[in-house]
Amino acid sequence: MKEYLDLCQLVLEKGHLKNDRTGTGTISYFGYQTRYDLQKGFPLLTTKKVHLHSIIHELLWFIRGETNIQSLVKNDVRIWNEWPYQKYCKSNYYQNETMEEFVEKIKNDDEFAKAYGDLGPVYGKQWRSFLGSDGKVVDQLQKVMEEINCNPNSRRLIVNAWHPAYIKEMALPPCHLLFQFYVNENRLSCLLYQRSADIFLGVPFNIASYALLTMMMAKVCNLEVGNFVHTIGDAHIYLNHIEQIKKQLSRTPRMLPKMIIHGNQQSIFDFKYEDFELQDYIPYPAIKGKVAV
């Protein structure tokens, strides 16, 4: 996707060297927006192979309101493993287990998973069970789906994952923290605000995930898809990802694939992994990079 490569090029050319929480170091650029027309194809990077399996399972995990990684690791999704493992390594119960041994325990031992696999009140918790100051719990995803159906012209079609009172309890505060739907001419668009964006590892997942969420919501609300608008605060390339980014910039983007959603779902909560079929995806080979924790 040219839009993604333009972001990469801009950050390399105009970004600033900046220290970060992980100690890795970044080239950072503040304030950027990209628009993807979902009528033109599914925005999954072709300049490297992206693991759609993980994207779909993670999105369904968010939608179910889950915060424990057990169901992810049972489906061979590894993207959240580092954070609970890092926390476990600092506990009194750590017995020099490797990451692989830790993940096997999470997968097969429900009590261990309950104790060490939870990420705190992260995305799914806030989407489905946002706790108000009055003690009332709000299912934001349910409410926004109902509002799209009942009042599509509303300017309040918002889901917010940023809960200041619980930030310290989260393994990682939400990076993609707020999204808003917009209906015009029977088409559903989505705007995401992302406070922090790891351009090499995170952004390709974020684009595809929210594009897919928009398609799913449009389907159950009997709408066509419009645009996915991606607004980023701190857009950064980690210093240990620069060569990987340059490799992508040397590759010519290919035609976007198509995403087919099978089934007759009536609610955003009805989707299953098997409902999704990606067609005509011809990416370049995958490029590896280490996640900064």
What residue ranges belong to the model's regions?
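Terminal, non-catalytic protein-protein interaction segments that mediate quaternary/complex assembly
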Residues: M1-V293
